[in-house]
Amino acid sequence: MNQKKYSFQDLLSIMQRLRAADGCPWDRKQTHESIKKHVVEEAYELVEAIDSGDNQKIADESGDVLLQVVFHAQIAAEEGGYDIDDVTDAICRKMIHRHPHLFGTANEPADWDEIKRKDRSQATVAEEMRGVSAALPALMRAEKILRKAEKAGYAAPQTEDFSMDELGLGALLFRVADQCRKHHIDPELALSRYLNHYITEFEEKENRQDET
């Protein structure tokens, strides 16, 4: 199988071959549970590629994310759950539903949050907050919850004193996430970039010590 340029259909065929009875032993034994961590890992590698501004890296990492979608769809299809066409159908329907001014009869852009709340039968802001995935990184989840609270007219608590226990330090991180949101800064990205800065400074310090 050697072509000048492969298509999405080729990717589906490759995954089916890998999962076949005489396919790759590692790929054959994987389950939704065993590979779910790779979805997160590949998504973050895509973010890193986007930050680099390198289009080839972005394309490569986008492919890795796409592979995870195809992998899960193949596993589900074998179990009689859903297939890749169901995935495509679901996202197409969702995008059409959430843009009625483009694909329906509405004249004004719809409120995405309002549509999602209705879709998920969320009657209150608290229910909407609980709808924010608990699997998200905590700072990202905090930012999303704070945004929903602000939209509903609620301000974040402005506690100045923080106890040095889990709940108190959690409140401190929550406050940091709120400040990031107010200044339009992604808290996860801010910490990630600071870590890169810290590693660079640490490396320079090590190099200076080696020279003495």
Regions found by a protein language model. Give the residues of each.
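Flexible "arm" and connector segments at domain edges
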Residues: 1-61, 67-212
